[in-house]
Amino acid sequence: MNITDIREQFPILHQQVNGHDLVYLDSAATSQKPRAVIETLDKYYNQYNSNVHRGVHTLGTRATDGYEGAREKVRKFINAKSMAEIIFTKGTTTSLNMVALSYARANLKPGDEVVITYMEHHANIIPWQQAVKATGATLKYIPLQEDGTISLEDVRETVTSNTKIVAVSHVSNVLGTVNPIKEMAKIAHDNGAVIVVDGAQSTPHMKIDVQDLDCDFFALSSHKMCGPTGVGVLYGKKALLENMEPAEFGGEMIDFVGLYESTWKELPWKFEAGTPIIAGAIGLGAAIDFLEEIGLDEISRHEHKLAAYALERFRQLDGVTVYGPEERAGLVTFNLDDVHPHDVATVLDAEGIAVRAGHHCAQPLMKWLDVTATARASFYLYNTEEEIDKLVEALQKTKEYFTNVF
């Protein structure tokens, strides 16, 4: 894996910000886009922009082939059994809401339980809050260990015969914790529950095999894996999807419309009302091609090395608190003593370094950590150890500045 060659494929990285070479350490928020994806979008809009499925003209056929070809690429990428199990959405948030609206509200009743964790992104909390409110079910939380990991014993104690849904992030966007999805799926299934996985932070960085994980639903976003914004995927087991009603209605998803009744298309199109995100899906297909050419195992090893190096360098700084386990995905969330995370991010930006600051759409986790906000540096395939060195040097400057000035 030649990082220099990889970086050459990302035009945005070759610029200066505030007089410094850009160091982009915010890929957990959104990844940068390789030239191959940008050119694919350009080609679509310049050469075969058209609506899909119903047109018999050449442009329509090419657009349909590109759109459905992207669906097949996603299917292979996550090893789903059938293209019928791959639904294009606006992103992970929409995918999770779709399950909460179409599956949860139809299957929950008073006395039932939905189980989640304290580390969830708001997109995997609020839909379940609304689902239990609408159905009279109960929302429960799996506790976290001191290092921000989940104990399978705690999962077994929390998930009961009353549990109908277990919803969990594969990788925490704050702690970098990689959750044991396969083992959690077995516990859920042994209790008659389904498991819903937020894969936004795992799919870009490691091989995903939904059949091996045995998850019932899996959500992902294109923009975090070198693809365009505005498009994502919901994977669902075919038997579950077939019994679910659509959450949205309109064109594209219908089979027949009468004056008082209508019927829906078969999977997956019954869940894709309206003109779909055609360019986005085709761009996602190009991103998958790009990632597979490099290799997800190679990417995962590179990021694991970066995370370990970052933790080692952070230990050399005084007055820094790092959150999360030793073994983690490629991100480090931290705070400098007596310096607000937004101030940290502002000073780093002056050095050309982009990090994220705030609650990271995880306010319950912030409360568990007993902080209001943190700073986060997140890594991807195009980052280097030299960039981590620049980050640590800039943090040392930041610490000295606030110590001396204030």
Swiss-Prot record:
Q: Which residues cross the membrane?
A: none
The entry lists its GO molecular-function terms as:
cysteine desulfurase activity; pyridoxal phosphate binding
Means of activity regulation: A Cys to Ala mutation in SufU (Cys-41-Ala) has been described to be a competivie inhibitor of SufS activity and a non-competitive inhibitor.
- Functional note: Type II cysteine desulfurase that acts as the initial step in the SUF-like Fe-S cluster assembly pathway. Catalyzes the removal of elemental sulfur atoms from L-cysteine by using the cofactor pyridoxal 5'-phosphate (PLP), resulting in the production of L-alanine and persulfide. Activity is stimulated by SufU, which acts as a sulfurtransferase that receives sulfur from SufS via a zinc-ligand swapping mechanism and transfers it to SufB.
Q: Which residues carry this modification: N6-(pyridoxal phosphate)lysine?
A: K224
Keyword line = Pyridoxal phosphate, Transferase
**Which PANTHER family does this chain map to?**
CYSTEINE DESULFURASE, CYSTEINE DESULFURASE 1, CHLOROPLASTIC
Entries under SUPFAM superfamilies matching the protein:
PLP-dependent transferases
Assembly behavior: Homodimer. Interacts with SufU; this interaction induces an opening of the active site pocket of SufS. Interacts with frataxin/Fra.
Record keywords: Transferase included?
Answer: yes
Q: What is its EC number?
A: 2.8.1.7
* A GO biological-process term: cysteine metabolic process
Q: Which reaction does it catalyse?
A: (sulfur carrier)-H + L-cysteine = (sulfur carrier)-SH + L-alanine
Identify which residues the record assigns to the active site. Answer: C361
Does the UniProt entry include the keyword Iron-sulfur?
no
Cofactor needs: pyridoxal 5'-phosphate
One Pfam family name is Aminotran_5
Give the protein name, as stated in the record.
Cysteine desulfurase SufS
Which family does this protein fall into? Belongs to the class-V pyridoxal-phosphate-dependent aminotransferase family. Csd subfamily.
